[in-house]
Swiss-Prot record:
Induction: Induced by growth on trimethylamine but not methanol or monomethylamine. Part of the mtbC-mttB-mttC and mtbC-mttB-mttC-mttP-mtbB1 operons. The lineage of its organism: Archaea, Methanobacteriati, Methanobacteriota, Stenosarchaea group, Methanomicrobia. The keyword Ubl conjugation does not apply. GO terms for molecular function: cobalamin binding; cobalt ion binding; methionine synthase activity. Acts as a methyl group carrier between MtbB1 and MtbA. Binds 1 corrinoid cofactor per protein, is subsequently demethylated by MtbA. One of its GO terms (cellular component) is cytosol. This is Dimethylamine corrinoid protein. Methylcob(III)alamin binds at H104. InterPro entries: Cbl-bd_cap (IPR003759), Cobalamin-bd (IPR006158), Cobalamin-bd_sf (IPR036724), Corrinoid_p (IPR012741), Dimeth_corrin_MtbC (IPR048095), Met_Synthase/Corrinoid (IPR050554), Meth_synthase_dom (IPR036594). It comes from Methanosarcina barkeri. NCBIfam families: dimeth_corrin_MtbC (NF041607), pyl_corrinoid (TIGR02370). Pathway: One-carbon metabolism; methanogenesis from dimethylamine. PANTHER family: METHIONINE SYNTHASE (PTHR45833:SF1). Keywords: Cobalt, Metal-binding, Methanogenesis, Repeat. Belongs to the methylamine corrinoid protein family.
Length: 213
């Protein structure tokens, strides 16, 4: 089986919520592919497709949750191959969440997984997160960066609010801020004073490494 076929089989298993198949294919892929490639082009690719189908009303929340569970199991099976920081990082500590009023979770969850697999210590605080919770968690874990996702134009302002509260708390110089999500852009990131904008999970990893090097 070619690498492309392995990755496609993995993506299909995620879409079908077949956890046992995911684990079996991950084991096969371990000897041929890097963990980051297995996650990005296999597991995350499948989860992205689940997200697309969910947004179009073709899949429902229980299916999404089962697919996410299968992806989590796949990532856990790769833990022994991940960089030494993946479970207690020295690359940097990142708090990642989706702002209050926004219940979208899939894209943010994929970003968290990719960052963790790259060697960051990631604290995923979920979706629909109150602004202050981002700051409190950052203080608690001594975060180097906060990732703020917003998937709706109506919740985009929450990204700006997190940055403003960081300033009020005297933490802005210490904590980097990355923004992302469908309505976010580089221009928006510049406008609100974020340190960077990431269009996707792969870019998020690259930007985080660049900022926290």
């Amino acid at each position: 089986m070619s690498k492309e076929e392995l990755l496609q089989e993995l993506a299909d298993a995620i879409i079908s919520c077949k956890k046992d198949t995911v684990l079996a294919v991950v084991e096969k892929a371990k000897g041929e592919l890097e963990p980051s490639e297995i996650i990005e082009k296999g597991l995350a690719a499948g989860m992205n497709e689940v997200g697309v189908r969910f947004e179009r009303g073709k899949l429902f929340l229980p299916h999404v949750m089962m697919a996410a569970d299968a992806m989590t199991a796949g990532v856990a099976a790769l833990k022994d191959l991940m960089p030494e920081g993946a479970s207690g990082s020295k690359l940097g500590v990142i708090v990642n969440g989706t702002v209050e009023g926004d219940v979208h979770d899939i894209g943010k969850a994929i970003v968290s997984t990719m960052l963790q697999s790259a060697g960051f210590e990631v604290h995923d605080i979920g979706r629909d997160v109150p602004i202050r919770n981002f700051i409190e968690k950052a203080k608690e874990v001594n975060a180097d960066m906060i990732g703020i996702s917003a998937l709706m134009t109506t919740t985009l302002q929450g990204q700006k609010s997190v940055i403003e509260l960081l300033k009020e708390e005297g933490l802005r110089d210490k904590v980097k801020v990355m923004v992302g999500g469908a309505p976010a852009t580089q221009a928006w990131a510049d406008k609100i004073g974020a340190d960077c904008y990431a269009e996707n999970a792969t870019e998020a990893v690259a930007k985080a490494k660049e900022l926290l090097a």
